[in-house]
C-alpha cells in the first residue's frame, strides 16, 4: 500500500516505493490519496505549514482539485483515489509502474473453503 500519496510532496516517490516493494517480494499493490477528514485536517495543515511552507498553497490547491473543490471527499468510489486530471495522472503512473514491475497481474481470489457454518442456530456462540 502506497499511502498517503500527497500531490507535489511525495507523489514523485511512487515508482521508487513500488520498485522496492517488488524487490521485497510483493505481488499486489494499491494506493490511497491523502484523505483529510475533520479529525486530521488541521493537524496536517499545521505540519505542512511548519515543514513545507513554500508548498502549502500548491499542495492544498491540488488536493481541492482532486476532491471536488473541498479538502475532503467522503463519497464512495472517489474518496480513496480522487477525481480530475491530477488524480488520473497519479493513478496512471501507479498503474504503469505496477505493469513494469509485474505487480497486480493476478489478484488473489477470496475463498470460502475454510468457512464453517455455526452449528447452533439462533443462539449466540461462546467466546471461549
Give the positions of each predicted feature:
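A cross-domain feature marking catalytic cores of carbohydrate-active enzymes
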Residues: 2-4, 33
Amino acid at each position: 500500500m502506497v499511502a498517503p500519496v500527497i500531490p507535489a510532496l511525495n507523489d514523485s516517490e511512487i515508482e521508487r516505493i513500488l520498485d522496492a516493494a517488488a524487490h521485497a517480494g510483493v505481488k499486489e499493490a494499491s494506493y490511497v490519496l491523502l484523505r483529510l477528514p475533520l479529525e486530521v485536517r488541521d493537524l496536517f495543515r499545521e505540519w505542512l505549514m511548519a515543514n513545507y511552507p513554500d508548498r502549502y498553497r500548491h499542495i492544498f490547491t491540488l488536493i481541492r482539485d482532486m476532491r471536488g473543490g473541498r479538502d475532503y471527499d467522503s463519497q464512495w468510489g472517489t474518496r480513496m483515489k480522487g477525481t480530475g486530471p491530477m488524480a488520473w495522472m497519479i493513478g496512471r503512473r501507479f498503474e504503469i509502474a505496477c505493469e513494469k514491475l509485474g505487480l497486480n497481474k493476478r489478484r488473489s481470489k477470496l475463498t470460502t473453503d475454510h468457512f464453517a457454518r455455526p452449528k447452533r442456530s439462533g443462539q449466540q456462540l461462546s467466546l471461549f
